[in-house]
Amino acid sequence: MDKKKLIKYGLVGGILGAAGSIVILLLCFMYSKVIVADTDYTLTMGMKLLGNISESEMQEQLGFVVAKILAACKKKEITKLALISSDMRNISENMQEDLVKKLKKQDIQLDVLAEIVTDSEAMSKLFAEGAAVMIEKKGVSLYQRVYDMVDLCVENEVSILGVIDTRK
């Protein structure tokens, strides 16, 4: 074989290999069972993203998120709402407590409700309050569980003000 054919086949093989790798990565991303990007909330589920909170910079980011929650509550005249998650064990207790305290200072009562899909008492509290903020952890929260919560809220006319995305 001459040198030109080796270069030609090498380039074509390299390009096809790279394209195949990209396709495989895209398919893995598209068919992932966990939430991996902010657009999963906004585009796929049609929910407003209230903000991203990382545990390392929690205080600065929490102020921004609380301001957005307050604006939504004021707009809809809400004084009591629930904090819901597909798995509240993934959300740090410090973050939950700080959200409750900051909103309480602004005369908004935030009740942390765990497992609303399976716990009937938490479910009835959610229905009584009529409004909720969802908090999920990117890379951990499962699509199906989040969809189940959203469906439950929509069916029972519970307004979801938005979602808070958390990460390490």
Model-derived features: positions:
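P-loop NTP-binding module
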Residues: 1-14, 18, 44, 58-168
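Flexible, low-complexity linker/tail segments at the boundary of structured domains
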Residues: 22-54
